[in-house]
Structure formats: structure tokens, C-alpha cells
UniProtKB/Swiss-Prot annotation:
Protein name as catalogued: Cullin-associated NEDD8-dissociated protein 1
Cross-referenced InterPro entries: ARM-like, ARM-type_fold, CAND1/CAND2, TATA-bd_TIP120
Cellular localisation: Cytoplasm; Nucleus
Entry annotated with the keyword Transcription: no
N-acetylalanine: residues carrying this PTM: 2
Induction: Repressed by miR-148a.
This protein's UniProt keywords: Acetylation, Cytoplasm, Nucleus, Phosphoprotein, Repeat, Ubl conjugation pathway
Biological process according to GO: cell differentiation; negative regulation of catalytic activity; positive regulation of RNA polymerase II transcription preinitiation complex assembly; protein ubiquitination; SCF complex assembly
N6-acetyllysine modifications at: 55, 971
Annotated source species: Homo sapiens (Human)
Gene name tied to this protein: CAND1
Amino acid sequence: MASASYHISNLLEKMTSSDKDFRFMATNDLMTELQKDSIKLDDDSERKVVKMILKLLEDKNGEVQNLAVKCLGPLVSKVKEYQVETIVDTLCTNMLSDKEQLRDISSIGLKTVIGELPPASSGSALAANVCKKITGRLTSAIAKQEDVSVQLEALDIMADMLSRQGGLLVNFHPSILTCLLPQLTSPRLAVRKRTIIALGHLVMSCGNIVFVDLIEHLLSELSKNDSMSTTRTYIQCIAAISRQAGHRIGEYLEKIIPLVVKFCNVDDDELREYCIQAFESFVRRCPKEVYPHVSTIINICLKYLTYDPNYNYDDEDEDENAMDADGGDDDDQGSDDEYSDDDDMSWKVRRAAAKCLDAVVSTRHEMLPEFYKTVSPALISRFKEREENVKADVFHAYLSLLKQTRPVQSWLCDPDAMEQGETPLTMLQSQVPNIVKALHKQMKEKSVKTRQCCFNMLTELVNVLPGALTQHIPVLVPGIIFSLNDKSSSSNLKIDALSCLYVILCNHSPQVFHPHVQALVPPVVACVGDPFYKITSEALLVTQQLVKVIRPLDQPSSFDATPYIKDLFTCTIKRLKAADIDQEVKERAISCMGQIICNLGDNLGSDLPNTLQIFLERLKNEITRLTTVKALTLIAGSPLKIDLRPVLGEGVPILASFLRKNQRALKLGTLSALDILIKNYSDSLTAAMIDAVLDELPPLISESDMHVSQMAISFLTTLAKVYPSSLSKISGSILNELIGLVRSPLLQGGALSAMLDFFQALVVTGTNNLGYMDLLRMLTGPVYSQSTALTHKQSYYSIAKCVAALTRACPKEGPAVVGQFIQDVKNSRSTDSIRLLALLSLGEVGHHIDLSGQLELKSVILEAFSSPSEEVKSAASYALGSISVGNLPEYLPFVLQEITSQPKRQYLLLHSLKEIISSASVVGLKPYVENIWALLLKHCECAEEGTRNVVAECLGKLTLIDPETLLPRLKGYLISGSSYARSSVVTAVKFTISDHPQPIDPLLKNCIGDFLKTLEDPDLNVRRVALVTFNSAAHNKPSLIRDLLDTVLPHLYNETKVRKELIREVEMGPFKHTVDDGLDIRKAAFECMYTLLDSCLDRLDIFEFLNHVEDGLKDHYDIKMLTFLMLVRLSTLCPSAVLQRLDRLVEPLRATCTTKVKANSVKQEFEKQDELKRSAMRAVAALLTIPEAEKSPLMSEFQSQISSNPELAAIFESIQKDSSSTNLESMDTS
């Protein structure tokens, strides 16, 4: 420390030198010292350093002054608080100095100090004291109005301080407001502007009293309307407040909007511009409160979008349909753009109107149909706007409209609505000719910006409506070529033009472009040769698509591609050979050449083998190998049967080596390539090549990556079909891995299907030691030997499916094996595991093969219904149902008879019936529907809930077989006197809803409202199942319930309330335990709310929704967990609404995070509380992603609390790490 002090005192001495270079060097060295974390200053050194730095702020040399200011930043964090106060005092005094240079440097110094203070959320005393000290001095400097430049600096610093530390200055907010309000009438506009900025920052942290004072003052002054100049300022101020604190100003809009509407009619363009900007901020920041006024705002914007009093457009509307490709008379185009009038401010009004319409379109999804009637035609008619900046905003507004129309939401392309013909998509379709007509002239404008807007517009239009431009390609192609050939085009314009052309080529049929290929190929080829790599890259994508257009392989085409092959090949091969080009260009050149060979390879002659050799080189390069593998896969799959023999000998071993690389995408791509090569080139592959591949397969077949396993198994299946002689190799490690995978509980879906296909392909090859019985022993051996017990039930199902697959492939082996399984079930010495496997295997085999010839099968299965093992009983139930599917006339009447005569076995038999209804063909079941229906209705009033649920599922699935007859019958049971019957039919409806279109859908849409009326049922359980059914509809097919939300939501929200009458106390020995019978129904209601966020957000009143979310935050553990998840979703879906409610949401979150578990609680209680805290913290982290959330005083206070509590701080930190790593993972595209 002594040496540091000595070094610093040395520097201080040099700072007093008369030589400015000495002073500069010493200050620079001091700066370096202060930036070191290790530096410790004693009191004396602190005092001297502070004094010297402040003195150097007045140095004659500007460079020394600037360095001294920079020293303030690190100095503030290294000295004691009273020294910081000295610095601040001196800077404030100097700010009022007569010397302009000293004032400026002191202002910069104050901003530097404020910037270095710890944020308000850290709860730092230093920050609070410094800010309080500065505030008093600033308010007096602002209020004096003596020197405008001092005022401007003071306002600047005040705004900076309020934005960073506003929450610490709550006590000063009234005095700050008092000094700021008079500045709104300052004769200097710059002062007014900075005052507005400061007020904007003030409203984000001030208390309600100050906020009300400010708004009342503005409203009162606006009502007086003393002068046009101040009225403009007040409107600007209101817009700024709305932008910064829309969630607070909302409740005053009823008073504000009529005033702003009135001022729109005043003949003052600047005032109009500010009024419309205010509307824009209301639309974006106060979505709920502005809703009643949206139509008024749209009408005002549409009026002023065309407001151009000094210009006449009439003469421009001559016939625009003739568009020449040569663009001969372009020189005199765009002369209108040069029209300029310095006094004409009307363009600002038009621009404000366009931006405001953009805001309306972007925030009001529910008004899309209305927008296409009114806003869309108006915007299209203004594409001819003469001011370039305004035109860009008109285009942007239309782009926003198109983006809102993207059919990501199921309701936008709801088939029912489509039939009515009035959906946003159909309305857009009808306006495409007008859009093209309006863009047509703009595409040859001189302005680069305008042409870029046109390309962005066309790209988005085609993304929203693929095929929309089919009729208009002849009009658009010349405009695209114009930009590609135009010497004045910027690189970005060419890239946009190419990107647009690519999207159009991808989304229209090839025939549409055939008349234009001759015109398109030369400019695209020229762009492939462009020196700028981004243009080359985009042009290669277009070339690849053009190749598919000139010779489509998936449809007959009479177009002659021959004249274009040489040009396309030559420009691509040049890029393929180049070594020093950009990575993206390398990859796209490979993909493009792959497409050329795939579609045109039979025309390449001697160029083909040479090009394939280049591919071989690219295959050996780590950077290009994955793209090359994909290109080879494309070529190998070509119907032209390209001759790949020259590269297979060297290529296949290289591909085999890729299977051991630690790159998942490469493994998957290579397996696809090898699969297609085996299918199409088996005669060119040698046994050695295939053996090399087989050697690499065992590590790929593993439950750790089911997708890779599935691809590997599919490859083996292809091998078994095409190259059976190679399979003798697999009996060792490959087969061991396969059998191991069959026993994995994770084997299901696509991987399981691939496994079944493989066993069927393998068993018919007749390979030694891999016959039917060999494979059967391998699969079932462990169960019979009991050497290794299979722990998971799923493993038995998988083995049984494999056994059935083998038996289907070898039907002659069937009877003997089935007989053996029957004996295994009968044998009293069989273990439960053997019985389980035997029953499941009988079920799987019987599903596909008629087993009615096995006379004792029925009695053996019924006997198994009495087994003491639940798993064996369940397997017997499944087996009976599955076997019945194989011969319905034999088994179905038997099952129905047993259900009637065996009440004790009813539950298991109903499960068998469910299996039959779920799996049998509709035609096969039709004759039995009436009998099954009658039987089910007898049991739908059963008191046992498990039985009722199976009956309901059977009823639902049966209804799908004959909806016209059965759905009305189900509906009839809604008036049953039995609450059990009502709950059964409502649950049955759940099983008629699926996420893909079905014949029942239109019928269901007409009557689902009747089933949902049971949300008003007096019985609690009926209401609960109604919510579960509603949730299923909202999740799988939202179009069924969208139009019912207005009537359903009040009942749904009603079920989120805690009901005291449903809470009771139960005595358990010496303890009293509280039971809440309403918990399950509340949970069901909150689950529905969560689902609605994803499927019907545009139909929700989000503020009403948030009221119930707030209640849920104070409810039971399960419901809190659900509402925390909702908050995370809401933070991204509707941040502005959440921001308005932030203060009310923070309190319950804080309560959860600070709750302590009683010391004598059980471990489970501690774990539950810990999980609650983590979930609450995730919600807090999500809320903090909303811009400006941390500026809420309550939120910043809660943040301070989190950071000062080690336990909460640790949880919060780990959650933030998790979310950032998740974001990184989602960016990993490989």
C-alpha cells in the first residue's frame, strides 16, 4: 500500500508540471492505476487525488481536461462517500460557472459520476446520497431560467439521473415536477424538448400523487389552449408519458383522446403530426383503454394518409398495365420525387398516419377482417406516395398487415370460415391484383429504398399466400431483372431482389416461369459471378431453384432446358472449384451443383465424372463434408439414375468413417445417403464396402439417441431387402444392440415401427442362425430364463410386437407358437413375467391373424382375469380386445355377453371393448354399434369413476363411427337426472376431438356449446369434466370453441375462485387436516386458461384474464405453479398489458419467495417450497425481460431484496444461466 501511495504521490506531483505533456501522461497513468481492482488509497491520498482531478478539470489544455473527466468514473468507486460528495458539489458549482468550457466539462463529469453509481435496485446508500445532493442543485439551476445553456445541461443530467436512479428520488419528485412544469412554456423549444424527456423518465418511477398532478396540469392547459405553440408541446408531452408509462396513463384516455381528436381538426400540420404520434403511443401502450377509440383513430389516419394539399396525383392514374422489360424511358421517371417545398410539412402528417396505422395493425389481431376492408385498400393506393420516407412507412405498415395475416393460427385457415369466403386470407387474395398494379410502377423507380420495399412486400405476400402471384409473373419479372441489371443498384438491393425471386420460384409451379427463363438466366448467372460473396450466395440459391423449374422431376414437362444447361453449369462449377471463397458460398455451390446433377446430369457428358471427383474432395474436407453428403443423397435419389460408379469405391468408406464422428447431423445425413445408395446402386457396391459400414453401426443403435437408432435400423432393413447376403455379418454385436434396444422402455413411435419392419425383412432372408425360431428365442429368452428380469412393462409390449411382426412374416410358424403361448398362460409353473409376455404376444398376433381356430383361447384368457397380478390381468384384458379385432364376428358378441354376465370382471372387459373400438375398422364395427351403444349406456351411471371413464372413452370413440346418429343421442343424455350419466357424456365428447380434421367436426361445432353448458351444472364433478373437455377442444381444435368464448369464459373464470363451503376439516388421529374439495376444479380451470393463451389469445380480454392470474398467485401450491408458468408466457405474448399490472403481480411473487417453512416440517414440505421459489423466480426473470419492468419502484425494490438475500440471489442467478444456455441451444441449428 505504501508503494502505491508513493507512486500516486509521484503522479500527483507531475500533474502540477507546467509542461502539458507531463500533465497528460501523469493523468493517463493515474487512470490506469484507478482501473486496477487491487488499488487501495489511504484517506490522505484519496483527498489529494480528488482535489487534483477536480483542479485538472479547469486545465488550460483540452486533452488533459478530457482525461480528467474520464478518471471520475473509476475514481467514484474507489474513494469514500464523503469524497464522492465533494466531487459532486464541485461539479454542480462549476456547472453554474460563467466559463462555458468549464460548464461543459462539469456536465460531462456529472453524467460520468451518475453513470458509475450502482443501480437503484442494488439499494446502495452512496447512490441515494449523491443523487439527493445533485437533485437540489439541478432543480434550482433549471428553475432560474437565467442561462439557457445551463438549463439545457441541467435538464439533460436530470433526465439521465431519473432514468437510472428515479426510484431513489421519490421524496424529491414533487419538487422536480414543480421545477419542470414551467419549462414546458419556455420560449426555447430545445428547453421544452429536454423537459419532456425528463418528465418521461419521471413518470416511470414517481408515486401516484405526482403522476396525477402532472396529468391534471396537462389536461387543464390543453383545455385552455392558450397558444398553438404550447398546445403542441403539451400533446408531445402526453405522447412521451404514454410511451414511457402507458400502463399509468390508460385511465385518463377518456379525457385525453377527445381533446387530441379536436386538435387534429386545427389547420396546423405540426400539431396534427404530434396528435397522430400521440394516437400511435396510445395504441401501442394502452391497448385496453384505447379499444373504444380505435375506429376513430383509424378514420383520422386514413384521412391524413392522403393529406397532400400542395400536389395533384390525378394525372398518374393512366393505364399502368403495359410494362416493358427494356425500361427504355426510365430516365424521366422519378422526377416527381425531386419535387420539394421547404414550407410543405404535410409529408410529416402522412408519415405519422402511416406509422399509427402500422401500430394499429400490429396490435389488434382481432380486427384483421376489418383492416382488409378499410386499411388495406387505403395503404395500397398510397404506394405511389411521392416522399420517399413516407412511402417506406406506408410499405412497412402493409408489411405489418401481411405478417399479422400469416396463417400460423388455426382459426385463420379454419375450414368452416373458408367456406364462408370472408377470411383475412381470402380477402387478401382478392386484393392481390391491386397490390401488383401498385407495385408494378414502383419496381422501376430510381429510388433504391423504394425498390427494396417492393421486394420485401412481394416476399412477405408469397410467404402468406403461396401461389398468389401465378397470374402476375409476366408483370413482375421485368421489375426484378431491372434491379439485377441496374448498375446503380446497391448490393443490398440485389440481395433483396434475388431473395424475393427465390421465394417466388419456390412457391409457384414451374410452368408459370417457363416463358421467362430466357430473360431470368443471364442476370442470375451474372450475379453468381459477382465479386461480393453475399450476392453470389443468394444467386446460387436462385440458380438451384431455377434448375428445378427448367426440368422438374416430379411432374411431366415439355420445356426444353438444353439451351440453359451450359450457362448454369459453368457459373456454378467456377464457384465450386474456387478455394478461397466464403464458407456459405462453398456450401451453396455444392448444394446447387448437387441439384444440377440431380435434374440435368444426363446432359453433362464428360463434365459429370470430373464434377463428382470435386465432390469427393469436398467430402474429405471437415468444413464442407455435411453439405456434400446431403448433395450426394439428392443425386443418388435422382430418377435419372446418375452414374456414381467413379466415386463409390472411395466415397463409401469415407461415408462409413463419418458414422463414428461426434457430429449428430453428420451421422443422420450419412445414414440417409447410405440408405439411398443401397436402394439404387446395390449392383455397384462390393461386400467390402458394406462390411465397412456394418462395422460402424453397433454404437449407433442405442437408447441414448432414438432418432439415430431409427435411421440405422431403417438402413439395415433396406440392406435386408436389397442385399440379403450381407446380413450374415450382423448376428454378433449389431443384433445384440438391437435386442437390447427392444428391451428399452424408451423404444416407441418411429423407432419401434422401424424395428418391426427390420425383423420382418430379416426373417424372410433365410440367413443362417437368423431364422424365425432363432430370432424368437433371442427376443423372448431372457423372460423364460429369468436370468435378467425386465423391469419395465413397456419392454414386454415391444417384445410382443416384434414376436407378432415375425409371425406375420412367417404365417406357417404361427399355430405352433400361438399354441405354446397358450400353454405358457395355462401352466401353473409359469412366472407372472412369462404369462405377461405370452398374453401380450397372443394379443399382438391375434390382432392381425385370426385365432378363432384356437378353441381354448377364450377360457385361458378369462382364467387370466383372475390372476393375483394386476399386470397380468391388464395384459389379459388387452389381449382379449386385440384378438377380437382379428375376428369380430367370433369374439365381439362373446365380449359383450361377458360384460353383461360377469359384473366382477366388468372393468377389465370394458378395457377389452375399448381396445376393440379403438383398433377395429369402421366397416367391421358398423353392424355391432347399436348393441355396444345399448350396453355402454347401462354402465354410464356406474358409481365407480374408473369404470365410468372407460365407458365414456368407448362412447366417444364409438360416436366417431356414426356421428350423425350417435352425437344427437349423446346430447340427449345431458338432461339426464343422474349426474354420473351427465359427466360420462361430457367426458365422451372429449374423445371425439382430435388435432386432425374428422367428419364429425362440423356436427361437433354445432352442438359443443350444449355440452359446455354443463359448466353451469349444479354438480361439481360434472363442471370439472366439462372444463377438461373444454381444455381438450381449446388445445386440439380451437376452431370448435372460439365463437363460444364470450359465453364460456365467465363460467370458466367463476371456477377459479376459492369456495369456502368446499373446504372441510378431517380429523386424522390427533391431527386436523384441511381438505379442499374445490381444488381439482380450480386446477382444471387454470389449465384451461393456460391453454387459451396459446390457442385463442386474440379472443381474450387480457386484463380480465390477468385478474384471475393474480388470484391464482395466492392460491394452493399446484395452482401457483400453473400461474407462474402463465406469467412466463404472458411476458412474451402481451408484455404491455403485464407491465400495466406489474405492481399487483410483484407482491404475491415476493410473498412466495420470502415464505419460510416451519423448522419441524417434513422433507417433502421443504422440497415443495424450494420448487415454488424456483418457479416464482422464473416468473420474475420473465417479467424482467419486459422493457422498462425494472423501472417499476416495487419491482426494483424486490430486485434489491433478491440481491441482498444469498439464497434468493443464488436461485435467481442459476435461473438466468439456464435461460441463457437454453437460448444458445435453440440457436444451434445443426
